[in-house]
């Protein structure tokens, strides 16, 4: 097991989370680790062997990983882990995989999963594109959730947004027919881009119709990102797509 942060505090940061732009790769996030508390460090030391998935670059048998056949739900960029923990608590019949590059959020969720005895959850602390490309088999996922990705609201930074055509096509490959993609954002401009990209992606059908959104589903709790956005006067858009 390769500990992302050993107990001495030496870092082994993940590679940049990237989206394609022509021949070069554009980072879709800026890595800000923030304060790493002693409790979060202990989480990596003690909890990672139970709940963590080390990146190997090889296809992974998810049924073997979880020890059962069950619907597989992937959340990309789970932040502090509130939505992923909520889902795991309220529907333990599913298996959940979370990907997050910011170590404090991973450490926090590791501790919460131990408190919940949530052995139907596994976490990656790695580049989501690499995980999807190399470790998740085509058609292996029943659902992908992407909640409040970085909006990169300055126009010159829009190319850094995660939801780009190449990434959408990658998601389609990893979802089984009949699967589901659920995205949420509190930036109207990003919702517009999501519609531009996802409505035009072969293999995805907007459940609410072209450029449509749905009320917040019961399986997504109101997150601190959403609360913050509403305080700033932002709307919230939930986009739900079926994989054909």
Curated annotation (Swiss-Prot):
Reaction equations catalysed: guanosine(46) in tRNA + S-adenosyl-L-methionine = N(7)-methylguanosine(46) in tRNA + S-adenosyl-L-homocysteine
GO annotations of cellular component type: tRNA methyltransferase complex
Binding site for S-adenosyl-L-methionine: 75, 100, 127, 150
EC number: 2.1.1.33
Keywords recorded for this protein, A-Z: Methyltransferase, S-adenosyl-L-methionine, Transferase, tRNA processing
Superkingdom classification of source: Bacteria
Protein task: Catalyzes the formation of N(7)-methylguanine at position 46 (m7G46) in tRNA.
PANTHER family reported for this sequence: 3-DEOXY-D-MANNO-OCTULOSONIC-ACID TRANSFERASE/TRNA GUANINE-N 7 - -METHYLTRANSFERASE, PENTACOTRIPEPTIDE-REPEAT REGION OF PRORP DOMAIN-CONTAINING PROTEIN
Record-stated family: Belongs to the class I-like SAM-binding methyltransferase superfamily. TrmB family.
Protein name: tRNA (guanine-N(7)-)-methyltransferase
Source organism of the structure: Stenotrophomonas maltophilia (strain K279a)
């Amino acid at each position: 097991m390769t500990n992302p942060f050993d107990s001495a505090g030496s870092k082994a940061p993940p590679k940049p989370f990237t989206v394609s732009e022509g021949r070069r790769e554009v980072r879709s996030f800026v890595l800000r680790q923030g304060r790493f508390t002693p409790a979060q460090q202990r989480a990596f030391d003690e909890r990672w062997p139970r709940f963590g998935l080390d990146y190997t670059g090889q296809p992974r048998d998810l049924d073997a990983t979880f020890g059962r056949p069950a619907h597989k739900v992937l959340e990309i960029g789970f932040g502090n882990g509130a939505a992923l923990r909520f889902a795991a608590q309220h529907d333990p019949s599913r298996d959940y995989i979370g990907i997050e590059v910011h170590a404090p959020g991973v450490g926090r969720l590791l501790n919460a999963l131990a408190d919940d005895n949530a052995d139907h959850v596994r976490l990656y602390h790695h580049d989501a594109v690499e995980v999807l490309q190399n470790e998740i088999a085509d058609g292996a996922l029943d659902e992908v959730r992407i909640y409040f990705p970085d909006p990169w609201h300055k126009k010159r930074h829009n190319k850094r947004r995660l939801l780009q055509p190449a990434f959408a096509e990658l998601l389609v490959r990893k979802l089984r027919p009949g699967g589901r993609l659920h995205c949420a954002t509190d930036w109207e401009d990003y919702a517009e881009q999501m519609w531009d990209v996802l409505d035009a992606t072969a293999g995805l059908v907007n459940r609410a119709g072209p450029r449509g959104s749905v009320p917040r589903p019961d399986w997504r709790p109101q997150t601190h990102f959403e609360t913050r956005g509403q305080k700033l006067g932002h709307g919230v858009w939930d986009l739900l797509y079926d994989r054909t």
